[in-house]
């Protein structure tokens, strides 16, 4: 039921974009209302109650509790469309540098809304990379790129990547330190993936990127933490988004204005 309803909303959202800038949506440069090229619906839980019902009461919460412990917070959500016939790549990156926390007990759960096969550019994960280094996502000119540099990629075993395909309803899980990405979608079919990030209650956000969200930092299982937990490993800080407008990962990685 959840997947069927989310897929219906996904199709509707793809035709709701018109002229002008709507910050709910991240659009490919070639997007037209009659020929939509949507990269992402930002924070779908803020716009459709069904998404929040799934994120706060559905199987994601059970999985998050199993992996993070009894006290779980919701952080943010997004719906990546990965449009067919060339939907843009997502270069290799780690998530936590975009929204650092006091520790690394933060993960992202995803669910495919359509069947996804290997030709549709499924998300790829480098196994074990969550135990490796945290990479710098700035370039040599100190510009935030949102992706791991070519030099640093030589430190990774990219050939070991596991690409997560499966039928509609397949769930993906990756820790906030996992190196992941996806190729351009050269198939004729879109590959919508609904993603929700959760943290242990004791992992506190250091930056305020998602604090404007209606449900950001909502306890979805257990209770709020009385003590924060700090990891001894450092975390990279992103630019001050309050002074420099935050662009989507696609805009950063493709160096779009």
Predicted regions and their residues:
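Short, structured patches in soluble enzyme cores that scaffold and shape functional sites
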Residues: 78, 83, 94, 111-115, ...
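Short, glycine/charge-rich beta-strand/loop segments that flank catalytic centers
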Residues: 20-29, 76-85
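Conserved short histidine dyad/triad with adjacent acidic residue
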Residues: 81-95, 176-181
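Signature of the catalytic double-stranded beta-helix
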Residues: 33-77, 100, 113
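Short, conserved beta-strand element in jelly-roll/cupin
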Residues: 67, 93, 100-118, 165-167, ...
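Non-heme Fe(II)/2-oxoglutarate
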Residues: 17-26, 171, 177-257
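Double-stranded beta-helix
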Residues: 116-183
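Single conserved hydrophobic/aromatic residue that forms the stacking wall/gate
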Residues: 1-11
């Amino acid at each position: 039921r959840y997947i069927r309803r989310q897929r219906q909303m996904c199709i509707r959202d793809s035709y709701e974009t018109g002229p002008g800038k709507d910050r709910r949506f991240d659009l490919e440069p070639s997007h037209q209302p009659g020929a939509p090229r949507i990269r992402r619906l930002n924070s779908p839980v803020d716009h459709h109650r069904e998404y929040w019902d799934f994120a706060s009461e559905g199987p994601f919460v059970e999985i998050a509790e199993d992996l993070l412990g009894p006290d779980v917070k919701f952080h943010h959500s997004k719906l990546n469309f990965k449009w067919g016939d060339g939907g843009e790549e997502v270069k290799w990156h780690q998530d936590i540098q975009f929204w650092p926390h006091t520790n690394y007990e933060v993960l992202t759960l995803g669910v495919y809304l359509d069947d996804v096969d290997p030709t549709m550019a499924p998300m790829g994960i480098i196994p074990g990379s969550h135990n490796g280094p945290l990479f710098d996502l700035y370039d040599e000119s100190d510009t935030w790129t949102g992706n791991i540099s070519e030099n640093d990629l030589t430190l990774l075993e990219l050939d070991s990547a596991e690409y997560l395909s499966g039928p509609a309803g397949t769930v993906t899980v990756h820790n906030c330190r996992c190196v992941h990405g996806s190729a351009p979608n050269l198939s004729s079919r879109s590959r919508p993936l609904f993603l929700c990030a959760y943290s242990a209650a004791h992992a506190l956000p250091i930056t305020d990127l998602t604090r404007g969200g209606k449900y950001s930092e909502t306890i979805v299982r257990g209770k709020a933490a009385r003590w924060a937990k700090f990891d001894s490993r450092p975390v990279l800080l992103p630019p001050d988004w309050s002074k420099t407008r935050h662009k989507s990962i696609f805009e950063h990685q493709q160096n779009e204005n």
